[in-house]
């Protein structure tokens, strides 16, 4: 199936869908640093467009006649990782995503976002819009560690299919979930040459040290060194030698996001940390894409 990626960032969603067997025709993004990385890793075009300009976007997307439109509208207005202030103006891009999809009416769409979007009236607004335009909807909160990602990262997915019943994809998604969460060691073995690592907590009441024998916490857009005189938190693993603890490097964090070692990253540390932290984990995207492909291959169900 042919698809286009809106708000593509550096390409986590694109790569996951490509690995699952989709043909990515084009991507759309307006952060130049992310566009440069995307171009270095994909052969199809990427357009530098502010998707608030819906007319221009629709004209370009229609040329590709996509079977599926996917995207993760910027989520800072919903995310607990940043200021949750819808007045800041990023949330209107969620409406732009819905407007573009409903104008083009591909057979499928996938919208990916943070779990907190469920608390926003915007989600109900666009759900009503999609239903009015004939989409059956499946919404799911997926823990990436059960979807082939060594990271406890919960994300919200809204998946639409024209002329379908609601919740149509739930059985397929459920069958594909792993029985247990994936740990860092499960995914990377001993290649990190460490047993414990530091992830800077949002506040010092939370743990900062993690074992590779558990899923990583959410990879965020910042990465800081362990402070001098770090006080062991009661929830940190017991018996850890602080002298042997370090934060993961930028590229190691991309591995936790399941970008392959062959994926080319370049740029400043600050930009890369933000790009990698904002990306949809590649294997989570592949998980959703594979569920769609499997659903398409299943025998036609009786409507009776």
Swiss-Prot record:
One of its GO terms (molecular function) is DNA (cytosine-5-)-methyltransferase activity. The keyword Chaperone does not apply. Belongs to the class I-like SAM-binding methyltransferase superfamily. C5-methyltransferase family. InterPro entries: C5-Methyltransferase, C5_DNA_meth_AS, C5_MeTfrase, C5_meth_CS, SAM-dependent_MTases_sf. This is Type II methyltransferase M.HindV. A methylase, recognizes the double-stranded sequence 5'-GRCGYC-3', methylates C-? on both strands, and protects the DNA from cleavage by the HindV endonuclease. It catalyses: a 2'-deoxycytidine in DNA + S-adenosyl-L-methionine = a 5-methyl-2'-deoxycytidine in DNA + S-adenosyl-L-homocysteine + H(+). One of its GO terms (biological process) is DNA restriction-modification system. Pfam families: DNA_methylase. Residues 1-299 form the SAM-dependent MTase C5-type domain. The active site is at residue 75. It comes from the Bacteria. Keywords: DNA-binding, Methyltransferase, Restriction system, S-adenosyl-L-methionine, Transferase. Its EC number is 2.1.1.37.
